[in-house]
Swiss-Prot record:
Upper classification of the organism: Bacteria, Pseudomonadati, Pseudomonadota, Gammaproteobacteria, Enterobacterales
Family the UniProt entry places it in: Belongs to the short-chain dehydrogenases/reductases (SDR) family. FabI subfamily.
Gene: fabI
InterPro entries recorded: Enoyl-ACP_Rdtase_NADH, NAD(P)-bd_dom_sf, SDR_fam
GO MF term set: enoyl-[acyl-carrier-protein] reductase (NADH) activity; identical protein binding
Reaction equations catalysed: a 2,3-saturated acyl-[ACP] + NAD(+) = a (2E)-enoyl-[ACP] + NADH + H(+)
Pfam families documented for this protein: adh_short_C2
Record keywords: Biotin biosynthesis, Fatty acid biosynthesis, Fatty acid metabolism, Lipid biosynthesis, Lipid metabolism, NAD, Oxidoreductase
Name this protein carries in UniProt: Enoyl-[acyl-carrier-protein] reductase [NADH] FabI
Organism: Buchnera aphidicola subsp. Schizaphis graminum (strain Sg)
Source superkingdom: Bacteria
Binding, NAD(+): 13, 19-20, 40, 64-65, 92, 163, 192-196
Residue numbers marked as site, Involved in acyl-ACP binding: 201, 204-205
Amino acid sequence: MGILKGKKILITGILNEKSIAFGIAKSMYKQEAELIFVCQNKKIINKIKYLIKSINYNTIFFCDVSHDENIKELFFNIKKVWNNFDGLVHSIAYCPKKQMHEDFVESSSRKSFNICHEISSYSFLSMARECKNMLNKFSSLVTLSYLGSQKIVSNYNMMGLAKSSLEANVRYMANSLGKNNIRVNAISSGPIKTTSSYQIKNFNKIQKIHKLFSLTKNHVSSEEIGNVAAFLCSDLSIGITGSIINVDHGFNLNGINSII
């Protein structure tokens, strides 16, 4: 029996077959979760339906998380399908491309700062607030972060700030929602080739360096992220909350490596 048998999980952020959220969906489906998907663009709903046709799911919704009223409407509609559920996977982020290709200080603006934090961090808090009364005991909220939240990663720039905000969100949300027996965690993933990651200047170099200095000398896969997300949404992780879990083949541990 799968570790998510009987669990209802909401997954956001699938864009295409390269999306980390798609890897998470496949892992959770293997573990027998019941799934609903949320996408951010109405134009790609049919494309996503085709992509996930091999995955048994309830339905797919659209939500523009930059508007609180849309988030309220999303959970109003979800309640028509699920009165209660057990988990939310937040795989949503956005940063203007310019911020990942030019000098951080010179290219940063109030507008880019606000939209990057609003979509990448605040949306997690807003979704949690709207759905908390629908969540079963020991439900799990999971989001995705990256090393650039804590360390300098070339060209990650404004997204690094937003991921720092997101990780702080995880801690404070875990504290606030703990009294409701709701757990909140983040997975800090190694670099994976996705449509979004290719917006980062010199991403291929970043990925090569990651493989060279990871402890196992391997790239991270979306399946590996999916397996950890499935664990975090299962009862096997019932004692884990407020944590940032690194899934990067140990890259985050490295200082001056003997390979030099």
